[in-house]
Curated annotation (Swiss-Prot):
Residues 931-940 have a biased composition (Basic and acidic residues). It comes from Mus musculus. Residues 28-579, 672-840 are extracellular. This is Glutamate receptor ionotropic, NMDA 2D. Detected in neonate brain synaptosomes (at protein level).
Length: 1323
């Protein structure tokens, strides 16, 4: 090898001068070639003298014959190697130095090869000193004492073929890491190099990724005695001990350890240093190794030696001579000659010359081995072996170290067997396995540390049973195994107490018999290459004939896996949440049946709509039909805000409430289940088993179904035995491994994969994207299990069965299944959530409807019983008045309307002016369409901007009673009262309101469609009043008021015959009227009624403050008129009837007048009592008070100037007319005869009234007009009073305050209040 400072380099001249000086100083200058004599100068080989020094008498016999053998073994081009053997007898360091110096001074040598028996630990420092002093290369071929050399002398060329202490520790720590022996203690004596030993340990543990547990260092004194040494060794509890000591010190240390019980099974000793060479043997295999005192070494001792520790002496010496020869050859190639080195130990130190020569020995190769040395003189890549002392005290190679890689023979002690127990053939098992996730998972070792993680077990792909494999033999590849079955194996080894060696089968199969030969794991057990086989090994009949199986630890079978295919949303996906049976049951059965049930209950209810038809009171009115019932139930199901008509009967309402609850459940279930069907559906094929037609006849499908399995397994065996046609078809689609089959499924090249259920379920749960699914949520066919295969009649079967049953009982198997067999994909939940709801799921709500129908029948019967029988037994009560007052008070508190201003004191009485009729208005135009709710609110609030004639006091009383709500039927007039002057005349004519559309039919008393008003004179026998002149209309007060009128009869031409105007002069154009002779025009229709003022002649304490709200002036401004024999109080009232009608107690509760205004009389005030109605009776059923029917004590103003006939005369009685005995009750047509003015007999304390003709549903049970004898007195809550202050009476009769106070016996007023409250809640 050419160095950097060759002759042609920049330092060539300086080196040439150095070489010339050395040549001149040499004692043999004639043999040194010149600079140009490369290759031998004269053509001959240059002689190379190498001294072979043996220290010890053991080498005396062999030293004489080593020279020729070494010279023949080492041949170097251009050099003539001449070994010279010398034997040193002295063993002490002084004798060794003197002998070496004398030898070197008498010989011309170029190098020294040293061999010793390591009895002199100080040999290495002496050799290192001599090399530095003389610049001679010295090679120690046996190691021995050279291992303790540290640090090295400067300029020394002392080389060692053995390994250093640091290199030995590196190999030892690899062994500890391989077996997970991480806890250890260092034991040393004070031998040379012990400090370096401890420092090397600190360096290796601190910089490692392994969690080493260094429990300390013990420094022993071998001369202290065994008791002291034993106590020191027991002071640290560690089963792994690293010992560094001299050979003579090892005997007392091991004796003390044996006495302390720290040797033998359970404890491992690693020895570092030259202590094991020589002594009781030369290391030859089979020869017992003894300590110097004859004591044997403990079994299980580990040591690290050089790879040539078993080579003979000639080979070891030849290796050292070859190192010197290769270095001299490189030096000769660079300089052309071999320099003479120093031979005088007492001469001056030549350190600079040694530094320049050392580099020629850095890269040397001989016999295909690397002998390159580092700066410390040790081999860079030594070949080392790990040896272990067996029970028969022989050394066995258990591992090798080459190229920084450790290879061990497995097992020494099983990692998961009894800890550190020596290998016992009777308790050691060879276990075969096969990779298949998740049962056996094979991974490479850690690339950084080269070891397996703690939850895995080392396993080999090839088992090597030889003790010392040849160098060219294939070595097993180190792998790491983990998984479900590996965890079971570890628990079995710990519970039963055996060690094991785990390896992977070479053919990668479970086991199948091919040409009479079994392969796979079954073949390994059957041919006794393995003691046990564990993995995903299915138990079947064919395998059970040749091997024994343990009890199954995993239940499995055959399953089918497919891939999800993307689909589209079906057009009928919105119907998928329910099955067809549920839809039919819902809309055909339930909706129809419940609708008919509600209709029947409503039709037969005492308060239902059919009541008007049955009694003939409301012909042509609103009815609750089957169509409306179905529409109501349909709207409740889908929660639509559509106009509906609600039933009024209690039974019908209960049924509707139950249906609403049913609709909530039905709609909520539909909404919750709809999302699973509206998403993009994924198609998953389904089969019933291996006998399904899709597997047995795949060609009949288009495209044909492609399915397969993994051959040579139990699945294929089952299919081949039971379904041969199916097996012959699927052979073309079989896959070599499970992973490849899953890839084919995802790629669409395979439609179905048949395999073990346990493996497929795990793969489906662990699949990325959850695209793979087992058919039927893991449905298993041909159920079986996984077991452990053993030899026939194996003694391990019973212990393994008992241990597995214990694991099953302790739920350890279940815990392992959750750990290894679970995943993130859960197909079961998805299928359950997307299933249709059938009749069984919705049976509860249908049963609820049936029960509700049964309960409704009971309520229906009770309702009729109460209405027809029990209600007549109930007496009057004040509870309803209290509840009504409380309800109205709560409404007033919750109302946002401002409180009305306080009432003003009543003004003094003023004379009433003569009434005047306003001019007729043209017919109203068509009313614009207004929604029902908005129209109702507008009609309620229209009167807020107007007030009654006579001032604000009238409105204050109205607002105090009703709160913010003002019904249209009681509107405060079309215009406010005009301010009056001093004469009491109005200053301007009143304003009118725009026409209003009739209200919709919210309640029973609201008309759906109003017929046209009959024209003037339509009623025979009732003359129409003469129309006042237009000029007088402007000066007269506000129009008169009347009771609300409701008529649902056909139009006037078909209902009332038109009378002769001459016989009815008051209907327009009579002789006595101001408009006589004028053509009769159709009267204009009114959109809203005029304001009405009512008086209560029997005030109650609750109405006392309302009684003072109006004075005489206010009453004077009312100017009402009442014509005794005409249903319309004045001519202008021929407009349209009002759109709202109110109950009697509402009308009677609002008083526009004052009790104090009545003119004083000497006696008690006379009352005008009669039966009041919500609507004006059609003629002749009307309430009237004739002029001559007034009491003589009443004050009456003069009649109007346009009134015809004699002046009115006073009458003593006023009452309700008795129905005509010959006129049917259902008829509304008036006869042509003159009106009947009934006279009633006055009794003490009251008036005897004839029975009335009820015309309204609210008054059908009015008890104020008894149907008994005429002598029955009108008393109690049915008394109604009306004061008639004018000669023509004040106005239509109204109920009194007593009717509000006593409502218990008046069903009509209770209904009217309920209707009024319902309308209040709507608005």
């Amino acid at each position: 090898m050419r160095g950097a400072g060759g002759p042609r380099g920049p330092r060539g001249p300086a080196k040439m001068l150095l070489l010339l000086a050395l040549a001149c100083a040499s004692p043999f200058p004639e043999e040194v070639p010149g600079p140009g004599a490369a290759g031998g100068g004269t053509g001959g080989a240059r002689p190379l003298n190498v001294a072979l020094v043996f220290s010890g008498p053991a080498y005396a016999a062999e030293a004489a014959r080593l020279g020729p053998a070494v010279a023949a073994a080492v041949r170097s081009p251009g050099l003539d190697v001449r070994p010279v053997a010398l034997v040193l007898n002295g063993s002490d360091p002084r004798s060794l130095v003197l002998q070496l110096c004398d030898l070197l001074s008498g010989l011309r040598v170029h190098g020294v090869v040293f061999e010793d028996d390591s009895r002199a630990p100080a040999v290495a420092p002496i050799l290192d000193f001599l090399s530095a002093q003389t610049s001679l290369p010295i090679v120690a071929v046996h190691g021995g004492a050279a291992l303790v050399l540290t640090p090295k002398e400067k300029g020394s060329t002392f080389l060692q073929l053995g390994s250093s202490t640091e290199q030995q520790l590196q190999v030892i720590f690899e062994v500890l890491e391989e077996y997970d022996w991480t806890s250890f203690v260092a034991v040393t004596t004070r031998a040379p190099g012990h400090r370096a030993f401890l420092s090397y340990i600190e360096v290796l543990t601190d910089g490692s990724l392994v969690g080493w547990e260094h429990r300390g260092a013990l420094t022993l004194d071998p001369g202290a005695g065994e008791a002291v040494l034993g106590a020191q060794l027991r002071s640290v509890s560690a089963q792994i001990r690293l010992l560094f000591c001299a050979r003579e010190e090892a005997e007392p240390v091991f004796r003390a350890a044996e006495e302390a019980g720290l040797t033998g099974p359970g404890y491992v000793w690693f020895m570092v240093g030259p202590q094991l060479a020589g002594g009781g043997g030369s290391g030859v295999p089979g020869e017992p190794l003894l300590l110097p005192g004859g004591a044997p070494l403990p079994a299980g001792l580990f040591a690290v030696r050089s790879a040539g520790w078993r080579d003979d002496l000639a080979r070891r010496v030849a290796a050292g001579v070859a190192v010197v020869a290769r270095g001299a050859q490189a030096l000769l190639r660079d300089y052309g000659f071999l320099p003479e080195l120093g031979h005088d130990c007492r001469a001056q130190n030549r350190t600079h010359r040694g530094e320049s020569l050392h580099r020629y020995f850095m890269n040397i190769t001989w016999d295909n081995r690397d002998y390159s040395f580092n700066e410390d003189g040790f081999l860079v890549n030594p070949s080392l072996v790990v040896i272990s002392l067996t029970r028969d005290r022989t050394w066995e190679v258990v591992g090798s170290w080459e190229q920084q890689t450790l290879r061990l023979k497995y097992p020494l002690w099983s990692r998961y067997g009894r800890f550190l127990q020596p290998v016992d053939d009777t308790q050691h098992l060879t276990v075969a396995t096969l990779e298949e996730r998740p049962f056996v998972i094979v991974e490479p070792a850690d690339p950084i540390s080269g070891t397996c993680i703690r939850d895995s077990v080392p396993c080999r792909s090839q088992l090597n049973r030889t003790h010392s494999p040849p160098p060219d033999a294939p070595r097993p590849e180190k792998r790491c195994c983990k998984g479900f079955c590996i965890d079971i194996l570890k628990r079995l080894a710990h519970t039963i107490g055996f060690s094991y060696d785990l390896y992977l089968v070479t053919n990668g199969k479970h086991g199948k018999k091919i040409d009479g030969v079994w392969n796979g794991m079954i073949g390994e057990v059957f041919y006794q290459r393995a003691d046990m086989a564990i993995g995903s090994l299915t138990i079947n009949e064919e395998r059970s004939e040749i091997v024994d199986f343990s009890v199954p630890f995993v239940e499995t079978g055959i399953s089918v896996m497919v891939a999800r295919s993307n689909g589209t949303v079906s057009p009928s996906a919105f119907l998928e949440p329910y099955s067809p049976a549920v839809w039919v049951m819902m809309f055909v059965m339930c909706l129809t049946v419940v609708a008919v049930t509600v209709f029947i209950f409503e039709y037969l209810s005492p308060v239902g709509y059919n009541r008007s038809l049955a009694t003939g009171k409301r012909p042509g009115g609103s009815t609750f039909t089957i169509g409306k019932s179905i529409w109501l139930l349909w709207a409740l199901v889908f929660n639509n805000s559509v106009p509906v008509e609600n039933p009024r009967g209690t039974t019908s309402k209960i049924m509707v409430l139950v249906w609403a609850f049913f609709a909530v459940i039905f709609l909520a279930s539909y909404t919750a289940n709809l999302a699973a069907f509206m998403i993009q559906e994924e198609y998953v094929d389904t089969v019933s088993g291996l006998s399904d037609r899709k597997f047995q006849r795949p060609q009949e499908q288009y495209p044909p179904l492609k399915f397969g399995t993994v051959p040579n397994g139990s699945t294929e065996k089952n299919i081949r035995s039971n379904y041969p046609d199916m097996h012959s078809y699927m052979v073309r689609y079989n896959q070599p491994r499970v992973e490849e089959a899953l890839t084919q499924l995802k790629a669409g090249k395979l439609d179905a994969f048949i395999y073990d259920a346990a493996v497929l379920n795990y793969m489906a749960r662990k699949d990325e994207g959850c695209k793979l699914v087992t058919i039927g949520s893991g449905k298993v066919f041909a159920t079986t299990g996984y077991g452990i295969a053993l030899h026939k009649g194996s003694r391990w079967k019973r212990p393994i069965d008992l241990a597995l049953l214990q694991f099953l009982g302790d739920d350890e198997i279940e815990m392992l299944e959750r750990l290894w067999l679970s995943g993130i994909c859960h197909n079961d939940k998805i299928e359950v959530m997307s299933s249709k709801l059938d009749i069984d799921n919705m049976a509860g709500v249908f049963y609820m409807l049936l029960v509700a129908m049964g309960l409704s029948l009971l309520v229906f019967a009770w309702e009729h019983l109460v209405y027809w029988r029990l209600r007549h037994c109930l007496g009057p009560t004040h509870r309803m008045d209290f509840l009504l007052a409380f309800s109205r008070g709560m409404y007033s508190c919750c109302s946002a309307e401002a409180a009305p201003p306080p009432a003003k004191p009543p003004p003094p009485p003023q004379p009433l002016p003569s009434p005047a009729y306003p001019a007729a208005r043209p017919p109203p135009g068509p009313a614009p369409f207004v929604p029902r709710e908005r129209a109702a609110a507008d009609r309620w609030r229209r009167a807020k901007g107007t007030g009654p004639p006579g001032g604000a006091a009238l409105a204050d009383g109205f607002h105090r009673y009703y709160g913010p709500i003002e019904p249209q039927g009681l509107g405060l007039g079309e215009a406010r009262a005009a301010p009056r002057g001093a004469a009491g005349r109005p200053l301007s004519p009143p304003t009118t309101q725009p026409p209003q559309k009739p209200p919709p039919s919210y309640f029973a008393i609201v008309r759906e469609q109003e017929p046209a008003e009959p024209p003037a004179g339509a009623f025979p026998g009732f003359p129409s009043p003469p129309a006042p002149p237009a000029a007088a209309a402007a000066a007269v007060g506000p129009p008169l008021c009347r009771l609300a009128f409701e008529d649902e009869s056909p139009p006037a031409p078909s209902r009332w015959p038109r009378s002769d105007p001459e016989s009815q002069p008051l209907l327009g154009g009579g002789a006595g009227g101001p408009s006589a002779g004028a053509p009769t025009a159709p009267p204009p229709r009114r959109a809203a009624p005029p304001p009405c003022a009512y008086l209560d002649l029997e005030p109650s304490p609750s109405d006392s403050e309302d009684s003072e709200s109006l004075g005489g002036a206010s009453l004077g401004g009312l100017e009402p008129w009442w014509f005794a024999d005409f249903p319309y109080p004045y001519a202008e009232r021929l407009g349209p009837p009002p759109g709202r009608y109110w109950s009697v107690d509402k009308l009677g509760g609002w008083r526009a007048g004052s009790w104090d205004y009545l003119p004083p009389r000497g006696g008690p005030a006379w009352h005008c009592r009669h039966c009041a109605s919500l609507e004006l009776l059609p003629p002749p059923r009307h309430l009237s008070c004739s002029h001559d029917g007034l009491d003589g004590g009443w004050w009456a103003p003069p009649p109007p100037p346009w009134a015809a006939g004699p002046p009115p005369r006073r009458r003593a009685r006023c009452g309700c007319p008795r129905p005509h005995p010959h006129r049917p009750r259902a008829s509304h047509r008036a006869p042509a005869a003159a009106p009947h003015h009934h006279r009633h007999r006055r009794a003490a304390g009251g008036w005897d009234l004839p029975p009335p003709a009820p015309t309204s549903r609210s008054l059908e049970d009015l008890s104020s007009c008894p149907r008994a004898a005429p002598t029955r007195r009108l008393t109690g809550p049915s008394r109604h009073a009306r004061r008639c202050p004018h000669a023509a009476h004040w106005g239509p009769p109204l109920p009194t305050a007593s009717h509000r106070r006593h409502r218990g016996g008046d069903l009509g007023t209770r209904r009217g209040s309920a209707h009024f409250s319902s309308l209040e809640s709507e608005v």
